[in-house]
Design a protein with these regions (language model features):
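C-terminal motif of bacterial Sec signal peptides marking the signal peptidase cleavage site
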Residues: 15-19
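Conserved functional micro-motifs across diverse proteins
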Residues: 20-196
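Bacterial N-terminal signal peptides that target proteins for export
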Residues: 1-7
Length: 196
């Protein structure tokens, strides 16, 4: 009886440990971002690289944290038209392969009315900018964006920033969708619904 109880305890422990594995992330080409917790956020396969949205939200230039995301903008870039606001998508990109690969440069947001937004590219002085990492060349083997031990990786979102000027009306035309296109083959794409 003691052996049966011990065996039952081991089986229960093994089942509990397997439930704790990171199966909450699924590799897909379409998915729904699961909100601020990142729980169940999809790993988006785009060519050889894997993209994961960490957070997406409106940005307030008057907020201290958000102001740091808006550094490195020219006066023309900083100007919002009436009915526009800042929107940020924070993501991580992983190269799990043994060779370098180019990260995507076409990452757009679209709404249900087919409005399409392209990211604003800040100067390299913006330490959170996705482009700071992605435009510097291929992503090394076994590397990630943002690189470890950088301001972006150690920041509150732990992701590299894609910065958009978005029409406020698009926030009503949800869901917003992030669309990622492989830089070498435009037929390879992935998309994720964004949290607002």
């Amino acid at each position: 009886l003691a052996r049966l109880l011990s065996l039952a305890a081991l089986v229960a422990l093994a089942a509990g440990l397997s439930a704790c594995s990171d199966d909450s992330h699924t590799r897909v080409t379409t998915g729904t971002y699961a909100g601020e917790s990142g729980q169940n956020a999809p790993y988006l396969n785009v060519g050889p690289l894997i993209y994961e949205v960490q957070l997406s939200r409106q940005l307030n230039p008057a907020d201290t944290e958000d102001a740091s995301y808006l550094t490195g903008l020219t006066p023309a870039q900083r100007r919002l038209r009436p009915g526009e606001e800042w929107f940020g998508v924070f993501l991580q990109v992983y190269n799990e392969s043994s060779t370098p690969h180019l990260p995507a440069k076409e990452l757009t947001i679209s709404d249900t009315q087919h409005n399409v937004y392209i990211p604003v590219v800040p100067q390299p002085t913006n330490e959170f900018s996705y482009q700071r990492f992605a435009y510097s060349g291929p992503l090394a083997a076994k590397a990630r964006i943002p690189a470890l031990n950088t301001v972006a990786a150690n920041g509150p979102t732990q992701g590299a920033l894609l910065l958009y000027k978005i029409k406020i009306v698009s926030l009503d035309n949800r869901p917003l969708e992030l669309n990622i296109i492989d830089p070498l083959d435009a037929s390879i794409t992935a998309s994720a619904e964004l949290d607002v």
